[in-house]
Amino acid sequence: MLLSDALAVAVETLSWMEIEGLSERQALARSSNQLGIKDLGSLRLAQRLVLESTRRQNLIEKLLELADPSLTYQSLKAGPRSFARIYTYWTVVKNVDWNDAVAFLKAGRKLLGWRELAPLELTFGKLLGFRPESALTDASDSESIALKTFHPKWYVEYCVKMFGRSNAIAILNADKTPPPTYIRVNTLAEDESTIVEKMKRDGIELDKIKGMKYVYGLSRSRGLPPFSKFVRSGEIQVQDKSSCYTALAAKPKPGSVVFDVCAAPGAKTSFLAQLMRNRGTIYSFDISERRIAIWKKEMKRMRVNIAQPFLADARQSLPLNIEADVLVLDPPCSNSGTFAKTPSAKWRIKLTDFKRFSQIQLQMLNQCANQVRLGGRLVYSTCSISVEENEKVIETFLGLDPRFSLVEIEPEIGKTGMKGLSKCRRLYPQLDECNGYFLAAMIRKAY
């Protein structure tokens, strides 16, 4: 039953991801609700099947092609195509025994019908004799790296060009495994030490992150139940270390006027409010009504009472004639720093997306700059590792607007920026055990 339910959810999830471009999390939630499957064991297995088969999409498609060169994978219906990906992961990558492979195939036939899978039966049989290394025969260097690290070939070539071969391979390999889970203890709910002690009594092991106020890592082996009582009560926020870094770098003071631009779903807003001790005003802007609705729920859960939401497109003037002491901009980006957590993102983006996003980011930065008071702080962050979306955006912005200059960021974690921007900070998944990230802090000065 567990395998059948998990497989049903996984196949449906992959199909929704492909048809509507949903993320793994969105598609999994939709599929489990649609099918009425709530068993946690089945959902965990479904999540693993989805994440790991999506992570290895290029390797899996190569193995399917080798098993049957006449097979046109993209011509298959969504259901059989999704099952073929999952089956290849299960039998070749996990290297299960013959009995497990047969049981898996039987579950697939029951789910989709034997007629739907009949064109793939020969392919499925051949795959039992394959190993992942089978896909590397006659591959070029960049193709081999792409298949070994599970990335598009163009992205491998981009990383090698930007970071050098050895650093690139380290970055790419880091995407194979999601980083640790981090939490932020919410002192708007209760005293930090009290919350930490309560969690420890419940058997949750925490590691304080050096130099980062209120931020803790969770033991990889124990993890955190997704709907634990501490999350529901607002005592903690599950938030990547990199995201927490933005709020700390902003250095908001109690009583400040803060703009949080592209703010939803609200993790940064709530941390800014925490650092301000719920004193002052935060104006949070986002373009999505749906995300603003989530933001409102998050502010209530996290005990934030100084933040106001505004529906706005940050590429245009913000709808407030007020100057900010601190403005935080976390614009849309390629998400190339989050491939370990959201592997589907790496198969959606193209090289040209780096330039496309950089144009949007620069447009937003130019608009936001006009809202920062003299002596005020402007913080820019992305969860991308591309130079185009980070150093080149900042370099261009500073060239266009001499009112701003870079300042040192505290705490000083990660590495310095590229292209000589030593005051910017970069976080790398293989070094910092978090999402890939970029951060720049600037002060508005007199001309």
Model-flagged regions — what are they?
Residues 1-223:
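Class I Rossmann-like S-adenosyl-L-methionine
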Residues 255-262, 283:
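Conserved class I S-adenosyl-L-methionine
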Residues 269-273:
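Conserved SAM-dependent methyltransferase scaffold
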Residues 276-277, 372-374:
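Helix-to-beta-strand junctions that scaffold the AdoMet/dcAdoMet cofactor pocket
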